[in-house]
Amino acid sequence: TSISAGVENRTNYTYLTNIGQSYTVDNSTLPTYNVKARQFDGSIQVLSANLQQNFKLGPLHWDNDITWQVSSNKEILPLPQLNIFTDLYFKFLYAKRLEIEAGANMTCFTKYSAPTYSPATGMFHLQNNSKIQEVGGYPLINAYANFRIQGVRFYVMYYHANNNLLKNTDSFFVPGYPLNPSMVKFGLSWTFFD
């Protein structure tokens, strides 16, 4: 078990914001992007607390990480109030050589008006106040299996396993960019020894 808490004081906080306005063409409202750097003259305090608790019962593991945080100025430094990561898996040795870890993990955070991504700059900026899109409140669940034998590691993951289970259109972690649909991912890492 690990518990931590803290207060961070940020002075002269620099951020990007979109000061562009929307315009109408052929009955369609289109946004303009005018991203500018700004500096907040005052100070912003961030209060946070974190709890990490891991359970183990034989080969069954359950790892949890919960973070609570609040910003004194949510318009300039928006943060989700609660972040949750949980990982439930079996970890065991097969035939005294092959390490196997199989389970599922979930990431979820409370809704908030997250910074949006600007492809032109490759950076995140605050959303335009004329149209705020909140993200969060949606669990992202992945099922996976990891295998390791000596210097070889292999994994297979079913990413966004709950995509077809929940009829929810709020599957965004970044405004305007939906999460990828369910997919299977593979990976291989092979360490060669000299």
State the predicted function of each range.
Residues 1-194:
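Exposed, low-structure sequence patches enriched in small/polar residues
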